[in-house]
Amino acid sequence: MATKTLKVTQTKSSIGRLPKHRASLLGLGLRRINHTVEVEDTPSVRGMINKVYYMVSVEEV
């Protein structure tokens, strides 16, 4: 069975944000504005996305 993937794009800067939110961005593999990564749709990834929802956009692939 194929796992779902999510396309996550950073839309805002991490400068001046909480350290936990910066760590979540790094955990997702995002390093700069307009950087896009594809990640597996798991509960831990969803949790990181929910923490930084205001800095990222998410699409299902």
From Swiss-Prot:
GO terms for cellular component: cytosolic large ribosomal subunit. InterPro entries: Ribo_uL30_ferredoxin-like_sf, Ribosomal_uL30_bac-type, Ribosomal_uL30_CS, Ribosomal_uL30_ferredoxin-like. The keyword Calcium does not apply. Disulfide bonds: none annotated. It holds the Pfam family Ribosomal_L30. It comes from the Bacteria. PROSITE patterns: RIBOSOMAL_L30. GO terms for biological process: translation. CDD domains: Ribosomal_L30 (cd01658). One of its GO terms (molecular function) is structural constituent of ribosome. Keywords: Ribonucleoprotein, Ribosomal protein. Part of the 50S ribosomal subunit. Belongs to the universal ribosomal protein uL30 family. NCBIfam families: rpmD_bact. This is Large ribosomal subunit protein uL30. It comes from Shewanella halifaxensis (strain HAW-EB4). The gene is rpmD.
